[in-house]
UniProtKB/Swiss-Prot annotation:
Alphabetic keyword roster: Ribonucleoprotein, Ribosomal protein, RNA-binding, rRNA-binding
Subunit structure, as described in the record: Part of the 50S ribosomal subunit. Forms a cluster with proteins L14 and L19.
GO term, biological process aspect, one: translation
Task of the protein: One of the primary rRNA binding proteins, it binds directly near the 3'-end of the 23S rRNA, where it nucleates assembly of the 50S subunit.
Database matches in Gene3D superfamilies: 3.30.160.810, Translation factors
Protein name: Large ribosomal subunit protein uL3
Family: Belongs to the universal ribosomal protein uL3 family.
Gene Ontology cellular-component annotations: cytosolic large ribosomal subunit
Signal peptide extent: none
């Protein structure tokens, strides 16, 4: 069986109680339904993968090349497309074009990796962006309390090294949180309750995949 995955929408966080009446913070993810639109093979594409689509969209907003891809698969256009890489070509036997994937691809207690786009913070200084300590609050410090300090030498090296941590745009990055636990699968509502927090804003697109470091299938 190939490594499983599904596209979904982060709905927000809540809390539930486990069998020991302990409070468990969970993130609610509307998982799917996804539809398989293409299966890639090494002979034709050079690698093994399955392409899945998710989300409603007006056909008028889809360009003709993409519309042709959906028509070839025999499905209505969807808003989002993603690929799940497969370990080997034999894993593609678990999928077929037009197949629908729902939250039931996962089970209670499964370990997953969740990928999303982190919240944008705008332009941020080094204390917020990189956790710099800042400078003294007193003892002669004047108007430098949140400044980063020196960014390098003078004549030597005569330049600023690449990768030097500075102020700049913070957030809106592709982030993956690994080894989260699926607390419960609500198949009736197509919802996953994932223990803990996941990246991104409410309403954001997320990809939920089997945890790679645990060898989940």
């Amino acid at each position: 069986m190939a490594r499983k995955g599904i596209l979904g929408t982060k709905l927000g966080m809540t809390q539930v109680f486990d069998e020991n009446n302990k409070v468990v913070p969970v993130t609610v993810v509307k998982a799917g339904p996804n539809v398989v639109t293409r299966i890639r093979t090494p002979e034709r594409d050079g690698y093994s993968a399955v392409q899945i689509a998710y989300g409603e969209i007006s056909p008028r907003k889809v360009n003709k090349p993409v519309t042709g891809q959906f028509a070839a698969a025999g499905v209505n256009p969807r808003r989002h497309l993603a690929e799940l890489r497969l370990d080997d070509e034999s894993a593609a036997a678990d999928y077929e074009v037009g197949q629908e994937l729902t939250a039931e691809v996962f089970s209670d207690g499964a370990y997953v990796d969740v990928t999303g786009t982190s919240k944008g913070k705008g332009f941020a200084g080094t204390m917020k962006r990189h956790g710099f300590k800042g400078q003294g609050a007193a003892h002669g410090a004047q108007a430098v309390h949140r400044r980063p300090g020196s960014i390098g030498g003078c004549a030597t090296p005569g330049r600023v090294f690449k990768g030097t941590r500075m102020s700049g745009r913070m957030g809106s990055d592709r982030v993956t949180t690994q080894n989260l636990v699926v607390h419960k699968v609500d198949a009736a509502n197509g919802v996953l309750l994932i223990k803990g927090a996941i990246p991104g804003r409410n309403g954001g697109l997320v990809m939920v995949r089997s945890a790679i470091k645990r060898g989940e299938k």
